[in-house]
């Protein structure tokens, strides 16, 4: 040991040292790793050819026991795998049996994430073939719990972490990502994760989960997806004190420091990947969400799922519900509990659709839509104190405080909850809705399940089976007086994967409101009479890939119509083109 330290002090390289001084009768230490002391640098050598041991640990190419005899010979896998060869279908069956044995959703989530880290195609095969069962596992509501506990369950990095430490070097950080042909980026700053608040850097679970759905449901290649978290600190005291927290331990940066980092990121993305890369803003706080969309909507291909995606999926549900309610959107009155990014985004898209259909000015159609916030009904007498995104919804009416009083005063046929506060649709509120509506439409959209404004059981029971109900998080079927009601799920997963695919295949350079309307109309067009007969206003998620194809084709058509598409010439059949562009998780055969 003394001789080793002497050689180090004399400036000798690790590779120049006598192997016998530190390695006792073992394999020769070619790279000097065993001879290096803890404070000495070594080179992290890797084998670049995907074969043998390396191939089995490459999630993009690993097939586990599904490697054929020929592949095992060609890629030096003999002896590295048990002798049996099984199909991808049998692998899927085995893993689903294992996952179903777990009692806790978080255990299932962890199992799925571990599968993605070792066999990417099998992960997507499971998710696509079992979408209704696994969607709540890899995304809402389970992903919320995963983000809360991310520091404890963190094993290996997923996605790209850009913190204030990287300010001035963001372009270099983007270049560290191994995949170069990126088409979709989902980025969060972790300030408003679902209905759970500020989770800081641990919000990375949301972009990771979202992009897995872009692939599974929308067919965007996994290698073309990039999850990003912008870490500017957190105001969550619990996380700041948590020894396992993985992010910056400081209060959240705001103002110029925040906007400069975001601007550097947006500029670097365009510089590195071009202007046809879709950037989806995810779970930003209200003030930043609206500002970012307004600031970059004219210069980048940007989309906010909380504002625009939620709006499109709710609008699709309302268009479907008209077949049960009768009339047009303009014939009905809408009331929102919650006037944040989701509430105002939905309201604006409903008003826009009304305006397009009825050829009425937007200012007029907005008057059919009422919003309430924590201070009560948004009315014109409050206009001076309102945030800018609430002002278009301040109508002439006397101030009304409580939700029950608002419902009785406005008498809406549609009640939409986007408050992020659970149990706010009380028995009295729901009963009031049923008292003046033959079929009250109740949408409890807040996530996760614990934050839902009411449950499906409550909606059906309190309206005596009259309600048309849909929620943001899934609920089990409800039996009331001998009849089984199947609650719909107003899940953004119906819209954003198909929208993303449509933007990618058309080479769109901007997201236009008419594309959102096109996506909503395509989704509403997939609802059949048999679904409506059960009170469903959304089609089954089991058909989501086919639905995404229709949405993608509609969105792409609108991009070409608006002159925003760059992939020319336009394909003759956009539906077939969308299908042909979708990623398939089936195993490839290797030479």
Swiss-Prot record:
PANTHER family in UniProt: MALIC ENZYME-RELATED, NADP-DEPENDENT MALIC ENZYME 1
Localization of this protein: Cytoplasm
Record protein name field: NADP-dependent malic enzyme
Gene Ontology terms: biological process: malate metabolic process
Annotated Gene Ontology cellular component terms: cytoplasm
Substrates-to-products reaction catalysed: (S)-malate + NADP(+) = pyruvate + CO2 + NADPH; oxaloacetate + H(+) = pyruvate + CO2
UniProt-annotated binding residues for NADP(+): 335-351
Region of interest (Disordered), ranges: 1-26
Naturally occurring in which organism (per UniProt): Populus trichocarpa
Record InterPro entries: Aminoacid_DH-like_N_sf, Malic_enzyme_CS, Malic_N_dom, Malic_N_dom_sf, Malic_NAD-bd, Malic_OxRdtase, NAD(P)-bd_dom_sf
Enzyme Commission number(s) from the entry: 1.1.1.40
């Amino acid at each position: 040991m003394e001789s080793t330290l002497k050689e180090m002090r004399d400036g000798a390289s690790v590779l120049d040292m006598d192997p016998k001084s530190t390695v006792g009768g073992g394999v020769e230490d070619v790279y000097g790793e065993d001879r290096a002391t803890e404070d000495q640098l070594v080179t992290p050598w890797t084998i670049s050819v995907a074969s043998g041991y390396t191939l089995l640990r490459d999630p993009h190419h690993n097939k586990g026991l599904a490697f054929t005899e020929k592949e095992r010979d060609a890629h030096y896998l003999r002896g590295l795998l048990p002798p049996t060869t099984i199909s991808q279908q049998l692998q899927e069956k085995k893993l689903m049996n294992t996952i179903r044995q777990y009692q806790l959703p978080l255990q299932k989530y962890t199992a799925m994430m571990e599968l993605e880290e070792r066999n990417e195609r099998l992960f997507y095969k499971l998710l696509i073939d079992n979408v209704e069962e696994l969607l709540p596992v890899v995304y809402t509501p389970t992903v919320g719990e995963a983000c809360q506990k991310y520091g404890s369950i963190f094993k290996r990095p997923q996605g790209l972490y850009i913190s204030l430490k990287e300010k001035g070097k963001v372009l270099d950080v983007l270049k560290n990502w191994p995949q170069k042909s990126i088409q979709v980026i989902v980025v969060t700053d972790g300030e408003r994760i679902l209905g759970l608040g500020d989770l800081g850097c641990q919000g990375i679970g949301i972009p990771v989960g979202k992009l897995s759905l872009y692939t599974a449901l929308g067919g965007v290649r996994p290698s073309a997806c990039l999850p990003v978290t912008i870490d500017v600190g957190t105001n969550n005291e619990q996380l700041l004190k948590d020894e396992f927290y993985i992010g910056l331990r400081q209060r959240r940066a705001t103002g110029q420091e925040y906007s400069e980092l975001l601007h550097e990121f947006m500029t670097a993305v365009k510089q590195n990947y071009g202007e046809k890369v879709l950037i989806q803003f995810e779970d930003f706080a209200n003030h930043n969400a609206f500002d970012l969309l307004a600031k970059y909507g004219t210069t980048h291909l940007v989309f906010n799922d909380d504002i625009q995606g939620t709006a499109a999926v709710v609008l699709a549900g309302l268009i479907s519900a008209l077949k049960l309610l009768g009339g047009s959107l303009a014939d009905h009155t809408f009331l929102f509990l919650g006037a944040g990014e989701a509430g105002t985004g939905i309201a604006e898209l409903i008003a826009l659709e009304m305006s397009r259909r009825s050829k009425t000015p937007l200012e007029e159609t907005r008057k059919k839509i009422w919003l309430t916030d924590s201070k009560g009904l948004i009315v014109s007498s409050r206009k001076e104190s309102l945030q800018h995104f609430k002002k278009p919804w301040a109508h002439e009416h006397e101030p009304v405080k409580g939700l029950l009083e608002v419902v009785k005063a406005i008498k809406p046929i549609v009640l939409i909850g986007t408050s992020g506060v659970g149990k706010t649709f009380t028995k009295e509120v729901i009963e009031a809705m049923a008292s003046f509506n033959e079929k009250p439409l109740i949408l409890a959209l807040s996530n996760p399940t614990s934050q839902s404004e009411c449950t499906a059981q409550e909606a059906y029971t309190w309206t005596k089976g009259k309600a048309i109900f849909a929620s943001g998080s899934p609920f089990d079927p409800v039996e009331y007086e001998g009849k089984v009601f199947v609650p719909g799920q107003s899940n953004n997963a119906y819209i954003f994967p198909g929208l993303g695919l449509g933007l990618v295949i058309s080479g769109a350079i901007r997201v236009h409101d008419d594309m959102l309307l096109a996506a909503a109309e395509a989704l509403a067009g997939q609802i059949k009479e048999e679904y409506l007969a059960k009170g469903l206003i959304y089609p089954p998620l089991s058909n989501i890939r086919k639905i995404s194809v229709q949405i993608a084709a509609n969105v792409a058509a609108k991009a070409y119509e608006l002159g925003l598409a760059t992939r020319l010439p336009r394909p003759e059949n956009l539906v077939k083109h969308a299908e042909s562009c979708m990623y398939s998780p089936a195993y490839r055969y290797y030479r």
